[in-house]
Each structure stands twice: as structure tokens, then as C-alpha cells.
Amino acid sequence: MILKAYAKINLTLDVLSKRDDGYHEIRTIMQTVDLYDIINIEKIEEDSIIVTTSSENIPTDNKNHAYIAASLVKERFGVKEGVKIHIQKNIPISAGLAGGSTDAAAVLRGLNKLFGLNLSQNELIELGREIGADVPFCLVGGTALCEGIGEKVTKLKSAPKMNILIAKPEVYVSTQAVYEALDLSKVKKRPNTDAMIVAIEEGNIREIAKNLCNVLETVTVNQYPVINRVKDIMRNHNALGTVMTGSGPAVFGIFANKYDALKAADRLKVFIKEIILTTTCENEFFSNEE
């Protein structure tokens, strides 16, 4: 069984408060983009989980989100058969694009079908919450408002198709460290999430671009000024709007046409290796079933 595991971007990301358990309450609008890992899942006779990947930079043991998802399903539902999972990585790693979470979501969906568990989407989402805050959104996909620590997902009207240029600087960002460094009393600009929802419902790309905002950006930019450099280049090449996604370091811009996006990409290639021109989309989970 072969599945697509789509990346996400945050059109808005607001941090409301810090909870007693150390996590933060957020309000964010997430959007699926047409950039995906390819997940190949097959049954094996031995009672084990084998994960392989095209990238040397991600773990293949119980630190891998796909492995965790498979382990959770096997344990929770008493599945005695084993699984072999291969991940063809196309989504930049540790970028703010939910690369690990979306792989986990694909494995949950795939094993549900492979083992005939007949779990509903809501039941899959409950499992996803145990793995990570972004997994529920990755199970739903499209355009959605995510609240709580990100795990409460409300589907929105699909955003219009937009040209999205993603650039990931070669720096490492710790999500936990970014949240810990965020001083909510010093946040000067917050997203207008409701205005973004209206812009999405109206299909107004310029208003969507105008309302892009991420309160985590100032924290990550303080550590890595290259993020502002990327944003400036995108704006100088007619991006309608640009913002960091998640805790970074990936940045995306919305462009009215591909020509401007490609010109920006050419300029960014001077100092950034991972650049992707894509579009917003809905989830299309199964690319092939055997």
C-alpha cells in the first residue's frame, strides 16, 4: 500500500497562553500544500515494525513518528502481524512543515485499512493526539482551524488554490526552545484569525496574504536573522505575503503567479538548498493500493 503524506503550512499562528503542563494553548489556521512524502506499507509475518527511509537524517526506531504510530496501532488493537514501512522523504526535515506528523497520520490511515480495523476519522484523530499535536490536522487536511495545543481541528472552507514558495534555511530550530523563549507579554503583533477565516471563505488571495502572521516568528528570527532575509527577497520579487511556518525555520510566500515565484527561487538558491514551489491543496491520501 502506497500513501501520500502531505506537508502543512500555518497561515496564522497565535499563542494564547501557557498551560500548567508546560504546553501552550494556540489558535492556528493550517493548510495542506502539494508537497508530500511517499509512504509504502506492507504486512510481514514476524511480529515486528521495520522502518526504512530515503533520508539518513531521520531515525528509524521508536523516535520516528511513523514507528510510534505503527506501535500504537499494534498495541491498542492486538495486531499480531508485523509491518514494514518505507518513507520516501520529500518534505524538508525539522522545518515547521509537519514532516514527522504527516508520516504518522499516513501510517494510522494505512494500517486502519491494511488490518481492517474500520476506525472512523474521529477515532483515528484520537489516536493521532497521542502521537503529536499536528497529527490530527494531518489526518483531516485541507484548510482547518486548530486549537488547544493544535489537536482540536475544525474543518474550514477550502482556501483558493495559491502559488506557494517554500524556502528552508539550513539551521536547526527546536520547537520546545522557541515556545520556551516566547514572552507573551512582549508580543506586539498577533494574527487576526477571524479576518483570515473571512478571507478564506471569500476566496480572497490578497486578503489571505495580507493576514499572514505567526507570533513565533520574532523568537526564531532573533536567533536566525536569515529568516528575515528570505522574507525580504520574497517580498522584493512580488510576494503578496510571506511568513515563517510553525516554529520554523521554513518560510513561505504567496505569489500571484509562478513567474515571480521562480524569480524569487532563483535569487534564494544562492544561499538556500531546500526550495520548493508548490500550491495549496486538499489531502488525497491513497495514491495506490495493493
UniProtKB/Swiss-Prot annotation:
<dbReference type="GO" id="GO:0016114">
    <property type="term" value="P:terpenoid biosynthetic process"/>
</dbReference>
<keyword id="KW-0547">Nucleotide-binding</keyword>
<comment type="similarity">
    <text>Belongs to the GHMP kinase family. IspE subfamily.</text>
</comment>
<dbReference type="InterPro" id="IPR036554">
    <property type="entry name" value="GHMP_kinase_C_sf"/>
</dbReference>
<comment type="function">
    <text>Catalyzes the phosphorylation of the position 2 hydroxy group of 4-diphosphocytidyl-2C-methyl-D-erythritol.</text>
</comment>
<feature type="active site">
    <location>
        <position position="8"/>
    </location>
</feature>
<dbReference type="InterPro" id="IPR014721">
    <property type="entry name" value="Ribsml_uS5_D2-typ_fold_subgr"/>
</dbReference>
<dbReference type="InterPro" id="IPR013750">
    <property type="entry name" value="GHMP_kinase_C_dom"/>
</dbReference>
<dbReference type="InterPro" id="IPR006204">
    <property type="entry name" value="GHMP_kinase_N_dom"/>
</dbReference>
<keyword id="KW-0067">ATP-binding</keyword>
<dbReference type="Pfam" id="PF08544">
    <property type="entry name" value="GHMP_kinases_C"/>
</dbReference>
<dbReference type="Pfam" id="PF00288">
    <property type="entry name" value="GHMP_kinases_N"/>
</dbReference>
<keyword id="KW-0418">Kinase</keyword>
<protein>
    <recommendedName>
        <fullName>4-diphosphocytidyl-2-C-methyl-D-erythritol kinase</fullName>
        <ecNumber>2.7.1.148</ecNumber>
    </recommendedName>
</protein>
<keyword id="KW-0808">Transferase</keyword>
<dbReference type="InterPro" id="IPR020568">
    <property type="entry name" value="Ribosomal_Su5_D2-typ_SF"/>
</dbReference>
<dbReference type="InterPro" id="IPR004424">
    <property type="entry name" value="IspE"/>
</dbReference>
<comment type="pathway">
    <text>Isoprenoid biosynthesis; isopentenyl diphosphate biosynthesis via DXP pathway; isopentenyl diphosphate from 1-deoxy-D-xylulose 5-phosphate: step 3/6.</text>
</comment>
<dbReference type="GO" id="GO:0050515">
    <property type="term" value="F:4-(cytidine 5'-diphospho)-2-C-methyl-D-erythritol kinase activity"/>
</dbReference>
<dbReference type="GO" id="GO:0005524">
    <property type="term" value="F:ATP binding"/>
</dbReference>
<feature type="binding site">
    <location>
        <begin position="92"/>
        <end position="102"/>
    </location>
    <ligand>
        <name>ATP</name>
    </ligand>
</feature>
<keyword id="KW-0414">Isoprene biosynthesis</keyword>
<feature type="active site">
    <location>
        <position position="134"/>
    </location>
</feature>
<dbReference type="GO" id="GO:0019288">
    <property type="term" value="P:isopentenyl diphosphate biosynthetic process, methylerythritol 4-phosphate pathway"/>
</dbReference>
